[in-house]
């Protein structure tokens, strides 16, 4: 069996990469079969090891230098590194290169961000990460195209493996009897750039729906936003809702939810709304989870949304356009057969998006690297 080392943020850190790493680790780990996993955790740009119990919950942490981090990771058969510029130290996260330069096991680099227009230094850092890796994983076809167009890499080293999602039961949770009030849901860590202000503005165009729609914004404020700005963004959204006259339609739920509770909430939604401001986002875990949960999606036209929803799993609208957003939501809630057609399309996509399926793809990739002939320098 293969033993996997990870270089990544990791819970209790609250960020998408930490959640991703924990889920992938869980589904790759198989102690009964002799396959173990370990993490060198990235915290505020520094490295530390973690001692874990069988459930992978953190007990203690020990700081590491780059050379010691590499030494720890070299104890595993394969290293899986999560890459995003903001999690590593140095300019554009360049400190990660000092670790990669010292690693002598096969490296799989998972690129969560492939910018369409990087700065010269961002391009240099990512190119060096690519050069230090034996395989590169991107999470969408759009990201693969951007990577091949903007960087020097053999196409055979690039794999597209989607972000994973939990497996859900086939039955949707029951509803209370009576007139159903539709729920529009946005969830995830909250902060500027999520576009929630445009969603609130869209509600004023949906006042005539009966029964009135409820817009549920679920999730805690992003820790970095909270540290820098406090709850200014969330407070501003509340003020906007009052000004727009839709405060009775908007509900904020800052509760931290475990995976089961979160997915139960998602399955109760009539529409998942992703009003993001970004025009370059090539992967979205929330989008993957919504599709895997077979929920109709309305999203702004960021690249991953255009790719995943283009076949009918959702509707894509222009950025920062409340009227277009409202029109799409109205269609999902009122147009006969549309929501069901979206769910059917999501159901066809869902099996390949589950974490067990995704983990199998990583497992196959790791085994192919270990089976490859070793080139010995003359």
Residue ranges and their predicted role:
Residues 176-194, 200-203, 216-218:
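Conserved donor-binding/catalytic core segment of Leloir-type glycosyltransferases
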Residues 311, 315-322, 331-337:
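Conserved acidic donor-binding segment of nucleotide-sugar-dependent glycosyltransferases
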Residues 142, 164, 221:
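Carbohydrate-associated surface elements
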Residues 272, 292, 296-299:
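Short hydrophobic beta-strand element within catalytic cores of glycosyltransferases
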Residues 120, 148-149, 164-180:
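Acidic anion/phosphate-binding donor-loop and adjacent secondary structure
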Residues 229-256:
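Nucleotide-activated donor-binding/catalytic signature segment of Leloir-type glycosyltransferases, i.e.
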Residues 331, 338-352, 364:
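A short, well-ordered alpha-helix in the C-terminal region of glycosyltransferases
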Residues 355-378:
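C-terminal alpha-helical cap of glycosyltransferases
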